[in-house]
Amino acid sequence: MGPLDRHLALEERLFHAVNVDGGRLVDAAALVLSSHAFGITGGLLLAVALWARRRDARWRLVAALGLAILLSDGVGSQVLRPLVGRMRPAYALPEGAVRWIAPAANVGSLPSLHAANFFALALVGTVGWPALGPLLYAVAAGVAWSRVYVGVHWPGDVLAGALWGTLAALLALAAVRLLPRRGKGPGPAEGGAGPGAP
């Protein structure tokens, strides 16, 4: 069985409030935030930044990033989406009712994996480099907004994605704590780590 239309009236109103014509510049920004290239580039840049900044925990943090994305994206796409089976707004609503400006296949809509992955990156990045936290979460929120703006997700999809990505990151951080330490490096003050660093 394919995805079914499982949205609420309130969520549809919220969707239409975000899925508006913001003009060429807003469209361009949303398309960049929604692109796979932006996600890949952002993840790689964060991995490099943590590797360079945190000599004391670089292996654990980079491993946590990779594991968080593996859980967030893999379990989200292979388990959660088929389990929920919710249709994207571009397919659920009548033709012409959605301003659809980004490609999206007719597959499960909840959770938004873009939102999940970016919130997973944001949490691991914040643990490894707390000063980056506000920027990372601002980017994650921007990506979540963009998925509704371009017409491919419901607001509930990106909220669920944020929650799932956060949980995936917490699981990844807990898992890498089990890895053996690779020698001693600078303390938290020198490495810029917070108290929750792995």
Q: In which residue ranges do the predicted regions lie?
A:
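Alpha-helical membrane-inserting segments
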Residues: 46, 71, 75-80, 168-179
